[in-house]
Amino acid sequence: LSKITAYLNMLTKRGCDIGEPYIKHLEDEIWELRPLRDRILFAYFDNNEFILLSVFMKKTQKTPKSEIQKAKRNLKNYMDRRREYEKQTF
């Protein structure tokens, strides 16, 4: 857990500039935070914000497509809710 916290702190401070081996761009808006065998899929926004989308234990060399698809669904859900909230707020 302390390694995950350290990686999240690094991501918060430096964004996607930290590069590999800490993070890796997978596809589209999806990035992978890589502490040990734990994997945290996230999306990164220009204003130094990110959203954690999926967490899993990596068991193979390649990130499972199902996990990437789950992260994309979660991101779409988040963006839809965010737009709806912004409509109601402003």
Task: Cite the ranges covered by each PLM segment.
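Basic, Lys/Arg-enriched alpha-helical interface segments
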Residues: L1-R37, D46-F50, M57-F90
